[in-house]
Regions:
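Positively charged n-region of N-terminal signal peptides that target proteins for export
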Residues: 1-5
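Short amphipathic alpha-helical "recognition" segments used for binding
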Residues: 6-7, 22
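Bacterial N-terminal signal peptides
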Residues: 7-17
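Acidic, metal/ion-coordinating pockets
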Residues: 21-203
């Protein structure tokens, strides 16, 4: 190879990576799933010492999750995205006592969640029950954007009409695009076929 070509090629090999990395942006993602209304965490409440950490066997709990989110946002200079992958309802007495008030969604918003999707247990009360939950949450205050991308509504049955109307109102969206620190972030949520409660779930 001629020396006249070596110098330009070496020069380009040095500056091109710098140009590429100059446009690099960092994003921190905090993700949760299957929280099932377990506000108090796991372990007897008598073991819980809220003013210290590492002094008890209690794990989880929404207050601790909120603390992690708050501290992470404070520590990081880059944008922080907070999402939940579903099953935030059901599983504890808290939900059963006030199951259609859906204060879980309002708490998630207060904790700093940007978006959530629906898991199979959000459908435990059937489409009509989920529609009432989402409507109640929306009417009671701000909630994270709910994203659900593979909903298919029946054209023969009216049992899912209320939930379909929720989608039409935009309470649940098929996808979401957010901007954080110059980044455009696309979010969508999927529920697998294996989550179908019927015998024909694999069809």
């Amino acid at each position: 190879m001629n020396r006249l070509f070596i110098i330009p090629l070496v020069f380009l090999s040095l500056i091109i990576p710098q140009i590429l990395f100059a446009g690099e942006k960092l994003l921190t993602i905090i993700h949760s799933n299957d929280m099932h209304s377990h506000f108090l965490g796991a372990s007897p409440n008598i073991d819980y010492s809220p003013l210290t950490t590492g002094e008890d066997k209690t794990i989880g709990g929404w207050a601790r999750i909120a603390t992690v989110i708050k501290e992470t946002k404070k520590e990081r200079s880059n944008p922080v995205l907070v999402v939940d992958a579903g099953d935030f309802l059901m599983g504890s007495l808290f939900h059963m006592v006030t199951r259609e008030q859906a204060f879980e969604l309002r708490l998630l918003r207060m904790m700093g969640y940007d978006a959530v999707t629906l898991g199979n247990h959000e459908f435990d009360l059937k489409p009509g029950g989920l529609a009432r939950i989402l409507t109640s949450a929306r009417d009671s205050g701000q909630i994270p954007q709910v994203v659900f991308s593979n909903a298919v509504f029946s054209q023969e049955s009216s049992q899912d009409d209320a939930l379909e109307n929720i989608f039409k109102q935009g309470i649940v969206k098929p996808y979401l695009v957010l901007e954080r620190g110059g980044l455009r972030i696309g979010l969508f949520g999927l529920l697998g076929l294996q989550s179908h409660p019927g015998e024909d779930r694999r069809r």
